[in-house]
């Protein structure tokens, strides 16, 4: 009795949502074109990173070799982007990595992914709103901050911000109202701001190459000491590296690349528009690939221009581009760049807010969150309750919190989502086509009979018995992918915590790494020998299983770099989420409701959506 109860409980945690023909139908308005998705991806990705991150990484971690940092980070992001693109073509639904996890690895992992995506978007929205407020305040001479500091102070350091940001609060609430009006209206604003941002960045790149000097990529310690003597400072080699193009060496490039990786976070918001894109199978993969390419070219060009215009050790991390134009004597250009930064932060803010309610909507639609959050406005066809609730929470956090200590927490959620999407692509590529036509019980019975007919042999592991996937080959890949995820996590843990003995050639730890790599290669070989699903898609990840595995390794390795405090905060957030899931979601899940319903066997089982409201509207 106890064993059966535990077995049923375990089945609830790993139950998966089947890919159904009805998943292409939606209650949201299909009004977003490929251009809209590219503008959304570029706007949400090409935000604070290009105006703030470039100066910080160049000065403190990489110097002129920041251009290589962005190249490495772009390659890492492309791996995740390719996986997102295939799933966007295969599963055209709203919810991004949440939905991808649901149809592949099960309900508990799907809830975990969705819950962390909500965390990432809320923190991202609040922090960008504070950055927008600070940039605007700096443009007008810091009058807002000086006034608030003189009247209202929050005396809780490391917990709350120094002062409440009324401007950031109003900004988030204003954009929340814009999103409530409809995706098409907010898409128009996104395209305008993104266009202005690209024009300003184009001006920065061209001006930088005109006014830049190649000698700034060949600086020596003597140049740095001369600058320090002019400012009565101390000449210290540690503070500027060893000079040249790579002043901080290979270690600096890798550390800088890890930071620059987060500058590409944001393209995943494209994947949440599956129910609002006019042609999701084509638009989503194209939007992701094109937006990542544009962002890389912009980051590469701006970082090159920035480090050519002035010595990297003179950069101001808070406002590197305006200060660079002041340094070369182009003072009026400072204000043009400041306006561009406001446009960039505006699109980045909207890009963070856009997917937030749609992930909540998708989870509520599936019953994992409260059903009221899935309510859609009849006039604008937008998830109005989810939009308002998420906007109010983000506005409250922007009002009270500085959020600098929560950036790593946001990154954990994003990297976890990236890793799960890569696992999902790997698993689903090798699964047989399944359609739920005669009820879930009949499908499960058919699967059990098929598995009994198939036998697990050595030949099934290393030789293709069939040219198309079977239930047995699909199960083999599922188990092997789970083992690979565990092994890659252990490998990243060893490489992070036992770096010194590995560098010194300790035979014990070197043997451990070699054994883990051998197991990874062997299990990967088993997956490689299984037949792949041949369903025609507009886009598929090339070189499977290699690229998804590399993506998983990179993401997990970056997660291992987080501090203990960050993991503690992450644990608190997950406790809140699990309380909601086990207290409400597991009993009200759509899949749970299906299991308790008695449906006629002749009736197709699909998602009940109001198709009369899935119309395309424009302005």
UniProtKB/Swiss-Prot annotation:
Q: Which residues lie on this side of the membrane: Cytoplasmic?
A: 1-36, 83-107, 184-191, 266-285, 357-382, 428-475, 529-540, 591-619
Q: Which residues cross the membrane?
A: 37-57, 62-82, 108-128, 163-183, 192-212, 245-265, 286-306, 336-356, 383-403, 407-427, 476-496, 508-528, 541-561, 570-590
Q: Which GO terms describe its cellular component?
A: plasma membrane
* Originating organism: Rattus norvegicus (Rat)
Q: What is this protein called?
A: Cationic amino acid transporter 3
Determine if Transmembrane is one of this entry's keywords: yes
- Which residues in this protein are found as Phosphoserine? 618
Extracellular compartment ranges equal: 58-61, 129-162, 213-244, 307-335, 404-406, 497-507, 562-569
The record's similarity note reads: Belongs to the amino acid-polyamine-organocation (APC) superfamily. Cationic amino acid transporter (CAT) (TC 2.A.3.3) family.
Q: Per the entry, what modulates this protein's activity?
A: Inhibited by high potassium ions-induced membrane depolarization.
Swiss-Prot/TrEMBL GO biological process terms: amino acid transport; L-arginine import across plasma membrane; L-arginine transmembrane transport; L-lysine import across plasma membrane; L-lysine transmembrane transport; L-ornithine import across plasma membrane; lysine transport; ornithine transport
What is the membrane topology noted in the UniProt record heading this document? Multi-pass membrane protein
